[in-house]
């Protein structure tokens, strides 16, 4: 019976995980996105040969996640353009006391290594923990100083938030200004990005509250912004400002932007918070525990698209943005891709329901074989989840369960563990009853 249930769940997830073709037209695709993800707030901005069009709330503020890196990258590139720092400057010279090791030997990291995501750091929270809420950029940098890199700097690409938070500290140490002050005065104000903020905006009225999946629904969900994590992923913006931002990049109104574009020559290149893709487009995605976003643009096609949402369904958000871009450039758009957290929500919603059913069955049955089989299977499943998920996601179980994963995940896990304990207790009771019967 257990095997049939598991196979049924897997089959259902596989069917629901296949891309589903979206309706043609941007409005239709946005409606399809809302229907599939249960996300209530989606804002889209399109740049098409100088004309900007908005879909949804253009003034509502979203966390833009790792789209923030392109702002930090531009801030650093401006310092390079002014000669205040050089790409081959050592990080240890720009951040006093900071060291890094590879193969147990101290090695030099450069500014370019950070900009190109070739530092040797990875995005593993286990190996390189993010800052706590009270940490400054300097305190966080010192907390990871001296840690072993996963590869020799400059040799292998590995996406990491560490690189761009270090760049934020380099901005502070080079300019004598706070990261926030520099980014506002040198990037946001000159580009007239009045609504974009470094971290949480002072005026919170226009913030669209983030949300989190759970039981095939969404719930409002807020996560405190950590000051030392802002340079890599915690700007707020709206599609009104992003339209201005895209216009500047597509029309080439800034020499630092041109320098960044020139650093993205071939497919897969990463530089200053941007990546070049197979079709020659340039873009970046963003995802925090309660928001997801994506931006892509092409100077050649004079097309740009950005999608902002208040739900962490990054893969689905990416596919929506890519589909809109494809349609605008005369290509066939694909389907909306089911995000991993959506799949998890489907699985653990089912696990929760199944767990409750098994709990009831365990409480009413007196069959030792059923209790032993069910208890053993649930114990094995619980242990595998507890051990494997941190390995798969490169983060602690607590962080996965209570910050990133859908609410159904931790609920389902607690139900599984409860079932294991209750089944064991019931088995002891059944055996005791049998013993008393035989004695009597």
Task: Identify the residue ranges that each predicted region occupies.
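Short active-site loop at a secondary-structure junction
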Residues: 37-40, 54-113, 151-161, 230, ...
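Catalytic loop of the DD-peptidase/beta-lactamase superfamily, centered on the K-T-G motif
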Residues: 23-49, 223-440
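Short, surface-exposed loop or secondary-structure junction motifs
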Residues: 103-289
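Extracytoplasmic/secreted envelope proteins and their assembly/folding machinery
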Residues: 27-31, 73, 88, 92-95, ...
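Cross-kingdom Sec-pathway N-terminal secretion signals
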Residues: 6, 20-24, 28, 63, ...
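Hydrophobic secretory-pathway targeting helix
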Residues: 2-24, 46-49
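N-terminal Sec-pathway targeting helices
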Residues: 1-7, 368-373
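Active-site SXXK
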Residues: 30, 44, 50, 63-88, ...
């Amino acid at each position: 019976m257990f095997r049939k249930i598991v196979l049924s769940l897997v089959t259902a997830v596989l069917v629901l995980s296949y891309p589903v073709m979206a309706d043609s037209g941007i409005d239709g695709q946005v409606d399809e996105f809302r229907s599939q993800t249960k996300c209530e707030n989606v804002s889209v901005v399109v740049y098409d040969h100088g004309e900007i069009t908005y879909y949804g709330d253009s003034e509502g503020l979203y966390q833009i996640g790792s789209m923030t890196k392109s702002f930090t990258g531009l801030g650093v590139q401006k310092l390079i353009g002014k000669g205040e720092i050089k790409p081959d400057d050592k990080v240890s010279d720009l951040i006093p006391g900071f060291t890094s090791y590879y193969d147990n030997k101290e090695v030099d990291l450069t500014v370019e290594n950070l900009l190109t995501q070739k530092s040797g750091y990875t995005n593993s929270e286990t190996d390189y923990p993010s800052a706590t809420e009270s940490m400054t950029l300097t305190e966080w940098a010192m907390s990871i100083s001296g840690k072993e890199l996963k590869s020799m700097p400059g040799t292998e690409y590995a996406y990491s938030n560490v690189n761009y938070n270090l760049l934020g500290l380099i901005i502070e140490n080079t300019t004598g200004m706070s990261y926030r002050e520099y980014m506002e005065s040198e990037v946001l104000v000159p580009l007239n990005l009045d609504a974009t903020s470094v971290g949480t905006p002072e005026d919170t009225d226009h913030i669209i509250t983030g949300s989190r999946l759970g039981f095939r629904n969404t719930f409002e969900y807020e996560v405190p912004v950590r000051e030392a994590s802002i340079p890599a992923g915690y700007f707020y913006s709206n599609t009104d400002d992003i339209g201005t931002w895209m216009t500047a990049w597509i029309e080439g109104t800034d020499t630092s932007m041109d320098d960044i574009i020139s650093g993205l020559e071939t497919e897969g290149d990463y530089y200053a918070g941007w990546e070049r893709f197979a079709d020659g487009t340039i873009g970046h995605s963003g995802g925090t525990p309660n928001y997801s976003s994506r931006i892509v643009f092409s100077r050649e096609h004079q097309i740009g698209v950005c999608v902002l949402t208040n739900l962490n369904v990054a893969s689905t958000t990416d596919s929506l943005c890519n589909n809109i871009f494809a349609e605008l450039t005369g290509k066939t758009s694909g389907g909306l891709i089911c995000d991993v957290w959506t799949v998890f929500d489907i699985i653990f919603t089912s696990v929760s329901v199944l767990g409750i059913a098994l709990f009831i069955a365990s409480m009413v049955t007196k069959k030792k074989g059923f209790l032993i089989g069910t208890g053993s299977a649930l114990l094995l499943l619980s242990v595998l989840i507890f051990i494997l998920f941190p390995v798969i996601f490169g983060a602690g179980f607590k962080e996965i369960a209570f910050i990133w994963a859908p609410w159904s995940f931790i609920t389902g896990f607690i139900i599984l563990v409860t079932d294991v304990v209750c089944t064991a207790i019931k088995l002891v009771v059944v055996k005791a009853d049998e013993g008393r019967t035989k004695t009597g």
